[in-house]
């Protein structure tokens, strides 16, 4: 069971430096760095890592769709054996800040972030696993899958039914609705959890 992030001195150094750099260079992003560090953000990413371990899926090369700063998820994925995490973002600040959180992995080639709207542009490389833990913020994943029919991989999708936020444009009421939106028929795992916040 995956119950925590291994908080090593390297992680501490990168995350401390990120906080200092955001304060100095990206003060307008400070609130977002707090939002990405909530207990519910960690819970949802721990859940992903735990289920991936239980399913024994091949997951050497992972694409994150809208992975934001990828602070928790990258640490967890590398910890369970992923060789490469490639985050696809549309926000240049998110890319730059994600490189700060994940400097140790960027430097050794295990983390990349590209500015690319993957809902309108095809993927140019293969991945074993595609993770979208923020489906509520974008078009249904069926659009992505139709754009990339040759991509033969597993999908991990998370969403919410919390419609109170302006940027939640695509909430779902159930796991079944999420799978239906993505046109995924062969579901290896389905579940839901109540997050702290």
Model-flagged regions — what are they?
Residues 139-197:
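C-terminal substrate-binding/active-site "lid" region of AdoMet-derived donor-dependent transferases
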Residues 69-72, 91-93, 119-121, 133-139, ...:
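Short acidic, S/G/P-rich loop/turn micro-motifs used as interaction or catalytic elements
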Residues 60, 126-128, 153:
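Conserved acidic residues
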Residues 83-89:
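Conserved SAM-binding motif I beta-strand of class I
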């Amino acid at each position: 069971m995956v119950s925590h992030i291994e908080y090593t001195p390297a992680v501490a150094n990168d995350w401390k430096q990120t906080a200092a750099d955001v304060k100095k260079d990206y003060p307008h992003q400070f609130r977002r760095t707090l939002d990405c560090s909530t207990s519910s953000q960690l819970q949802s990413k721990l859940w992903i890592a735990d289920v991936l371990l239980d399913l024994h899926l091949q997951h050497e090369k992972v694409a994150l769709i809208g992975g934001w700063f990828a602070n928790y998820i990258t640490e967890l994925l590398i910890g369970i054996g992923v060789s490469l995490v490639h985050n696809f973002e549309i926000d240049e600040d998110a890319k730059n800040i994600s490189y700060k959180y994940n400097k140790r992995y960027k430097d050794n080639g295990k983390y990349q972030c590209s500015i690319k709207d993957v809902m309108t542009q095809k993927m140019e490389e293969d991945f074993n696993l595609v993770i979208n833990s923020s489906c509520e913020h974008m078009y249904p994943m069926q659009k992505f899958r139709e754009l990339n029919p040759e991509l033969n991989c597993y999908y991990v999708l998370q969403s919410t039914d919390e419609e109170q936020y302006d940027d939640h444009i695509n909430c779902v009421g159930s796991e079944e609705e999420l799978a239906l939106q993505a046109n995924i028929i062969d579901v290896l795992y389905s579940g839901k959890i109540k997050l702290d916040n």
